[in-house]
UniProtKB/Swiss-Prot annotation:
The lineage of its organism: Bacteria, Pseudomonadati, Pseudomonadota, Alphaproteobacteria, Hyphomicrobiales. The keyword Isomerase does not apply. Its cofactor is Mg(2+). It catalyses: Mo-molybdopterin + GTP + H(+) = Mo-molybdopterin guanine dinucleotide + diphosphate. Keywords: Cytoplasm, GTP-binding, Magnesium, Metal-binding, Molybdenum cofactor biosynthesis, Nucleotide-binding, Transferase. This is Molybdenum cofactor guanylyltransferase.
Length: 212
């Protein structure tokens, strides 16, 4: 169940990448601690958002077991995470018209903070910003953020007419709140890009289970 401060915030799981560093395929379907990365992300985010929507390209049937609506990119040619964010914003505008904002996360981040939505929402409101992005360890994570639905036409123009692909090139146009999380005992935004990262995620998950 979501709290009263986050009930109206839909969540978008970005799984539209090509996973080149892992030899292709669906990176969020890789397994750690007996469950897929995607399952870990859903466990973390579902109590904070409603509904959850998955951005992925190709046959949506491969995600049927998760019971999520799957929205593909509308911009052709694997245009990157901005295309997935636009697909999510378009879905929210059509299916949750009362929602003013949407949270986006990478679907390969199994240790997302349980206060992600609450803190990003609070920062956006307190600082009166257009966007709020997560940060840790001195790095901003541009695909993990809170996006106003009203920016979707600006984003569409940036993608289609300006050929902008880098998330930070787009967000630099707006006032952004950056919210930082500690990296101890582990970075909550750790993501698995390589086989070595998967092994590290296994180790971190085992530590978390032991300390729970």
């Amino acid at each position: 169940m979501t709290s009263s401060t986050t009930t109206a915030v839909p969540g978008l799981l970005l799984a539209g990448g090509l996973a080149r560093r892992m030899g292709g395929g669906d990176k969020p379907m890789r397994v750690i601690a007996g469950r897929t990365l995607l399952a870990h992300v859903i466990t973390r985010l579902a109590p904070q958002c409603e509904p959850l929507v998955l951005n992925a390209n190709g046959d949506p049937a491969r995600f049927a077991a998760y019971g999520l609506t799957v929205v593909p990119d509308d911009v052709p040619g694997f245009a990157g995470p901005l295309a997935g964010i636009l697909a999510g914003l378009d879905w929210v505008a059509s299916h949750r018209p009362a929602a003013q904002r949407m949270i986006s996360v990478a679907a390969d981040c199994p240790f997302l903070p349980r206060d992600l939505v609450a803190r990003l929402t609070a920062a956006c409101m307190a600082e009166d910003t257009d966007l709020a992005l997560a940060a840790s360890g001195g790095h901003t994570h541009p695909v993990i953020g809170l996006w106003p639905v009203r920016l979707r036409e600006d984003l569409r123009h940036a993608l289609v007419s300006e050929d902008i692909r880098k998330v930070t090139r787009f967000t630099a146009r707006y006032k952004v709140a950056t919210v930082t999380w500690p990296v101890v005992p582990r970075d909550p935004f750790f993501n698995a890009n390589t086989a070595e990262d998967l092994a590290e995620a296994e180790r971190l998950a085992a530590m978390e289970d032991r300390d729970a």
